[in-house]
Every structure is written in structure tokens, then in C-alpha cells.
Amino acid sequence: MGMTSRRARERERLIQRLHEEGIRDPAVLKVIQETPRHIFVDEALSSRAYEDTALPIGFRQTISQPYIVARMTEALLAGGSLQKVLEVGTGSGYQTAILAGLAGLVYTVERIKPLLTQAQARFKHLGISNIRAKCADGLWGWPAYGPYQGILVAAAPREIPQTLLKQLAVGGRMVIPVGASSGTQSLMIVTRTADDFEMKTLERVSFVPLVGE
């Protein structure tokens, strides 16, 4: 069996597992199946790229478990169409690429320059042109291009940053893990109404902490 066909089968098995775990949005499953996760991990770990597990990417960061990527993306899409999305924590760029397949424009912020440089090279290699990226403190978001219909935060702050809430459009939603860096956190959906924010807890998760400068 060739490498290409082997990876295609691995992706199919991953999609089947995600479906069994409750991911139902066909658009989310399609873009995950079409996105080569092995491109976003170290070559030494590429044989594990389609396992449903988080993997290290250096700098004490990880590429998230595919189920969590799918769960967060599905939760974000449930709020409606996404013309502009803000991602806090580019990391390997895998979640960014998934969002780019489903949104008009993705603005992503990463504080670790080498990770961002690697991610941008991957976007170029894959021909993804609807991502705008910068190296900065993710706690501040990217207000110049807000408000956003969706905000996805890929690391866990102790509490929801007011700076990010301000960048959420009315009717938009934020998907964010919240809690102390040790142990598990709560994955939350925050929806902005005309005069308030509605919050809902999805499930328990474990993310690296969101660190400010």
C-alpha cells in the first residue's frame, strides 16, 4: 500500500471515529478529511498524525486532539455563517487551516514567532490564501479587523478576557476553554446579544494555558 492510500485510509478511520464520538456537521467532517494533519506535525510524529490524540509541536505547545478541533469548530459554526473569524493561538496552524476551509477570512494571532513562521509556511504549501496572521499577545486579539462573527481560542485563560469579548460581533460566538492551567478546564460558548453575553459550558477539556506578555 502506498503512502498516499495509507494516509487516505487513516483519515477515513479518523472521520469515522469523530462521527462515532458525536461530530455530525458534514462540512466540518469534510474539511477535516481533506486537511493533511501530517503536514502540521514533526516528521518524526507523522505516523501518528491521524490518531485522535494531541501531539507535541515544541515550545511546550501541542496540536490539539482532532475531536477537540472538530468539537470547537462545530460549536463555532452552529452560530451561523462566518465571514470573519479570529483565532487566538495559531500553534501548528492545523486548527487555522480547518477554519479557513469554512470561513471567509481567518485572522490568527500567535505569540511564539517560530511556531507562526512554520504555520505560515504550511499555509503557503497548501495554497491557503484566506488566512491573515501576526505575532502578538493573543490576549489582545486583533481589534483592527473586528468585530468577528466567530472567535476561537486555542489556549486556556483563567477567565474570559474582556478584550476578546469586545471584539465579538452582536450575534457572534466565541468558543474558549476557561480555567486554571493545572488539571482540566471548561470549554465554553459565549454568544453576544444586543446588550449582554450568554454563556454555556460544553464539556471538560485540557488545554495549555493562554499566556500574556
Curated annotation (Swiss-Prot):
Its EC number is 2.1.1.77. It holds the Pfam family PCMT. One of its GO terms (biological process) is protein repair. GO terms for molecular function: protein-L-isoaspartate (D-aspartate) O-methyltransferase activity. The keyword Kinase does not apply. The active site is at S64. It catalyses: [protein]-L-isoaspartate + S-adenosyl-L-methionine = [protein]-L-isoaspartate alpha-methyl ester + S-adenosyl-L-homocysteine. It is found in: Cytoplasm. Coiled coil: none annotated. GO terms for cellular component: cytoplasm. This is Protein-L-isoaspartate O-methyltransferase 1. It comes from Nitrosococcus oceani (strain ATCC 19707 / BCRC 17464 / JCM 30415 / NCIMB 11848 / C-107).
